[in-house]
Amino acid sequence: MNVVSAVSREFSYFKFFLKLVGRSRSFDKKKYTTVADIMEEQVDKTPDNIAIEFEDKKYTYREMDAEANQIANWAINKGYKTGDVISLLMENKPEYIFTWFGLAKIGVTVACLNNNIKSKSLAHCIKKSESKSLIISSDLMENLASAQEYIEGNLDVYVAGQDVQGYETLDDSQIENSKVRPKSSLREELSNSQSLFYIY
């Protein structure tokens, strides 16, 4: 991948989040409006419009929502709930948005970790965010290995992508959860003044 392509992708993600922030301002007076509410509203309005374009793949809002619902239902089955924090260490790709959106649907805060972070720095970010678990791309397992000795306490680790011995894999064949949208009441305790994600 050349530098121009990489910068273009980063800018696209930046614009995506700027649009979310811009839209959320119009909902400031509504106590229980969250970014997940806004995104689900857009899904319902334009389900067949393209939401994500990545390399040679395109995903409609309906498809994006279904993938996110699968993550949300997986997290529910694992016992995660509003107020919990999960760290996400993954390259910029559609699965990143699916995972983040899915967790936001049930009120889980995502600690977005830079995929260049390793060793003590990675362990520090996980500790600082008070993450209960880590979802990591299989291509970034070396990052985790370099931080393992510095991570305090128990940290549940789920791997997205290829199978890695000793870890639970987070992919379609392993998740096998419903793509039906979870009830928004699962995040009703949230307000739009609470943290959606942390960025490290």
Q: Could you describe each region identified by the protein language model?
A:
Residues 1-6, 77-78, 105-173:
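Structural core segment of the AMP-binding/adenylate-forming
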Residues 1-32:
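Flexible, non-catalytic linker and terminal segments flanking ANL/adenylate-forming cores
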Residues 12-23, 37-60, 196:
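AMP-dependent adenylate-forming
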Residues 27-32, 36, 48-93, 97-101, ...:
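Conserved AMP-binding/adenylate-forming core of the ANL superfamily
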Residues 31-35, 136, 166, 191:
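Residue-level signature of the cytosolic catalytic core of signaling kinases
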Residues 47, 165, 177-200:
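Conserved pre-ATP/AMP-binding loop-to-beta segment of ANL
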Residues 53, 89, 135, 198-199:
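Short hydrophobic segments within beta-strands
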Residues 56, 62, 158-162, 171, ...:
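Residues at the C-termini of beta-strands that transition into short coil/loop
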